[in-house]
Design a protein with these regions (language model features):
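Conserved donor NDP-sugar-binding/catalytic core segment of glycosyltransferases
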Residues: 180-218
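Short beta-strand-to-loop acidic/aromatic patch adjacent to the donor-nucleotide binding site
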Residues: 169-180
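Glycine-rich, basic loop-to-helix element that forms the pyrophosphate-binding segment
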Residues: 149-166
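A conserved acidic beta->alpha catalytic loop
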Residues: 111, 127-135, 151
Length: 270
């Protein structure tokens, strides 16, 4: 007699209404294999009963990791069906301020591209009159909207320029250029953003995020990335409510931004 595989086991648990048990199995599976698209699809099934937006994001992440043509078509069909029911999820406009530091910027952009499905975001970079060649590199990238300032406008003003240049129906992700986006980091930030209607913005943990620091210390970027693959997984209580967030990586709902307006330039630091 053939043994049940993990996906069949999860499906059986869900069909029997054992949702929390299925969540635990999905969590354990993603801790071992962070890019298993079938587990993200199963996670979407878990959320579908309570939160269609989070379910959609899970299916989108499943599509990103899926390398099977037939399964990709099936996942896309599920996403289209959910979209027709009315979802609030918006793509991201990733706004980055640039001032020199070409290699740092290249690493940041690369980390966005390799860890996120291209249909889920756009990149807007505002360059504050750099002189080290980063402007020319940015100009050569066909997936970046570039705003070139003739002088250094400062961080806040440049962020506002980027927000104004973003697609009007996209959520805004303000991201420092010295960040490296780890696997599933943006996915889980967006999951938090659509936890409920009361959430207006989300941020994340970092090795250098002030009060949002992780406690572990490693010697290389690759070690931090590995740490992220083991920790950017489903959790029962993954989010903390905050009245303010560290500014190195913040996603703001478009609806909220439309209500509160652009960054207040009286406050100089991000």
């Amino acid at each position: 007699m053939r043994m049940e595989n993990i996906y069949e086991y999860i499906a059986r648990l869900q069909s029997e209404g054992k949702w929390q048990e299925s969540f635990g199995v999905i969590r354990a599976g993603l801790k071992d294999n962070y890019n298993d698209y079938e587990l993200y699809f199963a996670l979407g099934e878990y959320y579908l009963k309570d939160n269609i937006d989070k379910a959609y994001l899970c299916y989108e992440n499943a599509l990103f990791y899926c390398d099977n043509k037939d399964d990709r078509a099936y996942i896309s069909g599920v996403m289209s069906e959910i979209s027709s029911c009315g979802i609030k999820v918006k793509p991201l406009s990733i706004v980055i301020v640039s001032y020199n530091s070409k290699d740092v910027m290249k690493a940041c952009i690369k980390s966005i591209r390799i860890n996120n499905i291209s249909s889920s975001y756009e990149i807007v970079v505002v360059d504050n009159a750099s002189t080290d060649g980063v402007t020319e590199w940015l100009e050569s990238q066909n997936d970046i909207t570039l705003i070139k300032n003739q002088d250094n406008k400062g961080f806040g003003a440049a962020c506002n320029q980027g927000i104004k240049a973003s697609s009007p129906d996209y959520d805004i992700f303000l991201l420092n250029n010295d960040t490296v986006v780890s696997p599933n980091a943006i996915f889980w930030m967006r999951m938090g953003l659509y936890e409920n209607d009361r959430v207006g913005a989300t941020s994340c943990m970092s090795n250098n995020g002030g009060f949002q620091n992780i406690t572990e210390v490693f010697d290389s970027v690759s070690e931090y990335i590995y740490y992220a693959t083991k920790n950017n997984i489903p959790e029962y209580y993954p989010y903390e409510n905050k009245v303010w967030l560290a500014g190195f990586a913040v996603i703001i709902k478009r609806d909220v931004l439309d209500q509160i307006g652009l960054l207040d330039l009286r406050y100089g630091k991000g």
